[in-house]
Amino acid sequence: MAALVAAAALAAAEPPPAVPAAAGSGGPTSRRDFYWLRSFLAGSIAGCCAKTTVAPLDRVKVLLQAHNHHYKHLGVLSPLRAVPQKEGYLGLYKGNGAMMIRIFPYGAIQFMAFEHYKTFITTKLGVSGHVHRLMAGSMAGKMSMTAVICTYPLDVVRVRLAFQVKGEHTYSGIIHAFKTIYAKEGGFLGFYRGLMPTILGMAPYASVSFFTFGTLKSVGLSYAPTLLGRPSSDNPNVLVLKTHINLLCGGVARAIAQTISYPFDVTRRRMQLGAVLPEFEKCLTMRETMKYVYGHHGIRRGLYRGLSLNYIRCIPSQAVAF
């Protein structure tokens, strides 16, 4: 889902035009390569900062979604105080290391997809300028599934580490988690538990978030163009949302989309935890997991457990990324 944000950023980016190189310089190709390397690193670092900022909320959400027995009796925000008391403040960042590692290959796949599609659109379809950047960004967004599949094992490891509580560690670190899951849970297949609800949850999330953001933008610029809009830097005759309004609309769109797709997120997390949970044998498939969660915990405290944390994290994560 973060890939949708990455695709939008890619679509908005445009490398500087190639200029004749002076004698002894690296030439236009090397300059363009450096530009994309710089953009990739900047995007990855921004992603790391954004994820680290909301890491405590992510860790608490995992504990609540899977009803960790140490914290299941607490409300949504109480674990933010209980975790530091029991595990120290670093306990709020368990699993964040695996997330940081995941961001770089995830971003690399997005950038490679964008470049591949941009070249294809330019050479095969003859489209250039803003149109081909938007088309390439859209197609790169569709490649998010590839990025998810390639980096999914790191997400599984991240969730396993985040669910552990001090004094009851099953895994001593990232490498040990990889080795243990591979050895005890069916080899590579053990790293892809929960992939189906992940993929199924991406479709409603993407469609609802884009539709909601587009609607908010259209309505806002139609009824309050002076208050909410500003002239585009590319074309002064075109109005775009002001930065803080764009941020707010993006946060609202994400919150609505996450509400609709959240049961898939709960299902994914519980399946990713696999043998760590005592009900593992009863939740081998997506259908079994959803049925178990609904039957034992209902809708509010089961399929939507921890949703309010998603609302809280929408704005700060977007703000830091910007």
Curated annotation (Swiss-Prot):
Gene3D superfamilies: Mitochondrial carrier domain
An annotated GO cellular component: mitochondrial inner membrane
Subcellular location field: Mitochondrion inner membrane
Entry's Gene Ontology molecular function annotations: coenzyme A transmembrane transporter activity
Membrane in keyword set: yes
Keyword check for Mitochondrion: yes
Keywords assigned: Membrane, Mitochondrion, Mitochondrion inner membrane, Repeat, Transmembrane, Transport
Solcar repeat feature ranges: 34-120, 128-219, 241-322
InterPro entries recorded: GDC-like (IPR002167), Mit_carrier (IPR002067), Mitochondrial_sb/sol_carrier (IPR018108), Mt_carrier_dom_sf (IPR023395)
Main subcellular location of this protein, as a coarse class: mitochondrion
Membrane topology category: Multi-pass membrane protein
Biological processes, Gene Ontology terms: mitochondrial coenzyme A transmembrane transport
PROSITE patterns assigned to the protein according to its UniProt record, in alphabetical order: SOLCAR
Homology family: Belongs to the mitochondrial carrier (TC 2.A.29) family.
Reported function: May be involved in the transport of coenzyme A in the mitochondrial matrix. Very little is known about the physiological function of this carrier.
Protein's name in the database: Solute carrier family 25 member 16
Organism expressing this protein natively: Rattus norvegicus (Rat)
UniProt lineage: Eukaryota, Metazoa, Chordata, Craniata, Vertebrata
